[in-house]
Amino acid sequence: MKVAKIPYLNAAPFYEGWGDDPPFETVSMAPRDLGVAAGNGTIDAGLMAVADWFREDASFELIEPELGVAASEHVRSVILFSNENPGRLDGRRVAVTRESSTSRRLAQLLAVAYWKADIEWIPEDELRGDPAEEVDGFLLIGDRALELMADEVHGGWARETDLATEWWSWQALPFVFAVWAVRSGLPRRERARFGGYLSGSLALGSERLESIAAEHAGTLGDAETLEAYLRHFTYRLGPDELAGMRRFRDLLAEHDIQEYQDARA
């Protein structure tokens, strides 16, 4: 069994019980790459960006118990950096991190349906210099977003817009960024065993948030700030989180949100 993990601080509590020799093969991937691997059939389970799971749900099912990465009101690591508020980015160019899968779709959805801004989305790979000089905004996620938030000048940007805050203001529901999913074709016993193993590892990680934060303190922020960051996440998905996930899926369909490359055509 090959399991993909996301190498971000917000996912670290899931891995606390894995040790150096977990009972499965592991690979570390950014969210977008993990989604590609799931589609190609090269992984059996992973912490999958929820937008990718929407695409792959015929082949992957949520593990039991349902686990993921969700937040209410704010997240601090899915940030649109800009010099204007989002509603004033109409006709402007905004770069999107190469790592993102769910957050770039959330940004597109917010732009179309909430901010009412026609934004030109630019893949990060097209940037050649300082983003603050080339584009009007930059969407970052995960540890890169945390690092820029911890920087005194925020990379030269004047404004930071937390996409979880925008979603909460609009829909008053938690936002689920990623879910643990396992290939449906695996034997039922193997799927159940993995779900139990992961749940137990998370239980251990949840008891060690202070030490996890201390281990990562530095460029991402101080230990106290990072512990508060970790404690804000919901990792065991309940009815509100699942409702938020369904609402996101429905809104993506309603507004015909596609890959940002397609949206530029």
How would you label these PLM feature ranges?
Residues 22-34:
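Short catalytic helix/loop segments, enriched in acidic residues and glycine
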Residues 1-20, 29, 75-136, 143-144, ...:
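Bilobed "Venus flytrap"/periplasmic-binding protein-like clamshell domains
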Residues 9-10, 30-32, 42-54, 59, ...:
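Beta->alpha turn/N-cap motifs
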Residues 38-39, 131-132, 252:
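Hydrophobic residues within well-ordered alpha-helices
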Residues 256-265:
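Conserved C-terminal helix/tail region of periplasmic/extracytoplasmic solute-binding proteins
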